[in-house]
Amino acid sequence: MKKILIPFVLLTIVIFISSCSSTKQVAYFQNIDSISLAASRGLYDAHIMPKDQLTITVLTTKPEASAPFNLSVRNAISTDGQLSMSGGSLQGYLVDNDGNINFPIVGSLHVQGLTKNECQDLIKSKIMPYLNVNENPIVTVRMSSYRVTVIGEVGRPSVIPVTTEKMSIIEALAQAGDLGIYGKRGNILLIREDATGQKHSTRLNLNDGNLINSPYYYLQQNDIIYVEPNKVKAQNSAIGSSTTLWFSVVGIITSL
């Protein structure tokens, strides 16, 4: 009886210790109370990058004045100045590899690195000479292709469109169904492409409250987040494989 009881007690102790350890690994922002949130970045503004799709509209008091600066609903203009018809609902300007768009009447505009508001101001300054002196046009710019990708140990791996042009890593993970219990929260991989096409990677720790002050807290367009499986997932997979093998062996032996 004692021989049976001792392994059971040891197993119970191991499970208890593992549960305490796993709680520390699962909780987000564990040291948040000791961190100064005043140091966090202010309101985030996305910056335009090559291959972004921009939707731009110009409004004036007289519609005929702004008409030349607006694409029709089913048209799109490329950087070589060619106007093409599109059967889809999306319209807009594709930023070329040099960071330029070809805007009607005005011509080529360099928009790479600008925020949405800066791009609006630039376009407004360029079209003013073509408008009546009394006109005060309203220019609206939207990034219609803004998206991030979340894969790995999450509830719903997916490509997530960002309609607000602002998304934190926490929001992205939440939309992807959050991390599963087997997700490695202390070592999230973020892959980011810069304006030159070079890819960079960094590791983020969701357990650390300092993440909120990180320059990687807010995601850029086309960021990729990968959540690795933790050791428990690997161990469970190994145990599952071994168990299946032993059941197969036992089945063969008992059938003889």
Protein language model regions, located:
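Bacterial Sec-type N-terminal signal peptides, specifically the leucine/valine-rich hydrophobic h-region
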Residues: V14-I17
